[in-house]
Amino acid sequence: MARPKRVGKKKEKKSIPVGVAHIQATFNNTIITFTDTRGNTVSWASAGQSGFKGSRKSTPFAAQIAADQAARRAQENGMRTVGIFVKGPGSGRESAMRAINAAGFKVAFIRDITPIPHNGCRPPKRRRV
């Protein structure tokens, strides 16, 4: 016997005019997350989720497409002004910032929060190609 469907309130759209865009650009992928000022996720996208696989995920074009998708979803929730936090050494940093700017957001600030070790863990060995 099929379960009866639960009838409840529909999820109401929250209007979040000011938010923060977090861009995490690694060597293999780029992840863009839009949050409100308290850090609750509003929308996100990544190069892999946008349909890119393998080494194409690490390209600037993939980061641009992912940033555009995340920005569009954030704008549906009423976001108009963003601050941008950039983390990581990846190649998608600049293009993701440009895509967010081109999506029509008013950019309040851009801050680089890449963690820099004070001689912490040993880095991976150099590649020999």
Swiss-Prot record:
GO cellular component, one term: ribosome
InterPro entries: Ribosomal_uS11 (IPR001971), Ribosomal_uS11_bac-type (IPR019981), Ribosomal_uS11_CS (IPR018102), Ribosomal_uS11_sf (IPR036967)
Keywords per UniProt: Ribonucleoprotein, Ribosomal protein, RNA-binding, rRNA-binding
Gene3D superfamilies in the record: Ribosomal protein S11
Pfam families referenced in this protein's UniProt entry, alphabetically: Ribosomal_S11 (PF00411)
Origin: domain of life: Bacteria
GO biological process, one term: translation
Spans through the membrane: none
Keyword set includes DNA repair: no
Alphabetized GO MF terms: rRNA binding; structural constituent of ribosome
Homology family: Belongs to the universal ribosomal protein uS11 family.
Job description of the protein: Located on the platform of the 30S subunit, it bridges several disparate RNA helices of the 16S rRNA. Forms part of the Shine-Dalgarno cleft in the 70S ribosome.
Quaternary state and interactors: Part of the 30S ribosomal subunit. Interacts with proteins S7 and S18. Binds to IF-3.
Protein name: Small ribosomal subunit protein uS11
Native species: Oleidesulfovibrio alaskensis (strain ATCC BAA-1058 / DSM 17464 / G20) (Desulfovibrio alaskensis)
Gene: rpsK
